[in-house]
């Protein structure tokens, strides 16, 4: 399959992964390896984490991003105290510490970063906000926190993906889907660049499509 210049295969994988021919090169082909690494890290000792921090001690930006992703709250607090601008630093893909803490599900780190001035509406190079990250990985508590702070529930990525569409495609994101569907300002019928709504995605990829009755005005009781 040939893609036009600048086409983002990650966006296609979120919506039409079943349509990509076997053998098509993926922009996320190391995901399984990364998952295995994450499992290994969860079993590491405190000494291991301290060694990892030592390796990054001369690069505060890298250390901040790493610490936010790995739930190292004390390290995040220390770095923010020494240089407040680090709460909005970015990696090469535009992910901020808030993005990383959001997709990793670290509520205390998320709250601290927001209290310290982290940009709630920061976008990656693909147009993802922290709410997109939390929704994609099914972290309902994080999504709830971001929404309470003012995150835009209908924000769209460069591929026109909404947080609802991302949650709709994840079988493990039931609570996140329920949360998003309960938002009064939600526009559940928005379509992505492939022309699909969140309901279409849920119908194809999960068993949660029945939840979309929540978003029908006639079923809402105020």
Descriptions of predicted regions:
Residues 1-58, 219-222:
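Intrinsically disordered, low-complexity regulatory regions that flank or link repeat-based scaffolds
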Residues 57, 91, 124, 157, ...:
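Ankyrin repeat boundary/linker residues
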Residues 71, 105, 138, 171-172, ...:
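Ankyrin-repeat intra-repeat helix-capping/turn positions
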Residues 87, 120, 153, 187-188:
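Ankyrin-repeat inter-repeat connecting loop/turn
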Residues 181, 188-216:
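Leucine-rich solenoid repeat scaffolds
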């Amino acid at each position: 399959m040939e893609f036009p210049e600048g086409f983002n295969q990650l966006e296609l994988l979120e919506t039409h992964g079943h349509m990509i021919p076997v053998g098509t090169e993926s922009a996320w082909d190391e995901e399984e390896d990364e998952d295995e690494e994450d499992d290994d890290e969860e079993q590491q000792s405190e000494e291991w984490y301290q060694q990892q921090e030592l390796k990054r001690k001369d690069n505060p930006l890298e250390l901040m991003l790493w610490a936010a992703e790995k739930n190292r709250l004390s390290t995040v607090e220390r770095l923010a105290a020494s240089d407040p601008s680090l709460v909005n630093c970015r990696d090469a893909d535009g992910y901020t510490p808030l993005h990383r803490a959001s997709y990793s599900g670290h509520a205390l780190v998320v709250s601290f970063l927001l209290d310290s001035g982290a940009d709630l509406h920061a976008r990656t190079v693909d147009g993802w906000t922290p709410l997109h990250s939390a929704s994609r990985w099914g972290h309902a508590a994080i999504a709830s926190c971001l929404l309470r702070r003012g995150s835009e529930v209908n924000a769209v990525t460069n591929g026109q993906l909404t947080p609802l569409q991302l949650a709709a495609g994840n079988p493990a994101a039931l609570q996140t889907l329920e949360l998003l569907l309960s938002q009064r300002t939600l526009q559940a019928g928005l379509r992505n660049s492939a022309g699909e709504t969140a309901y279409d995605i849920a119908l194809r990829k999960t068993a949660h499509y029945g939840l979309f009755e929540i978003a029908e005005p006639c079923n809402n009781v105020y």
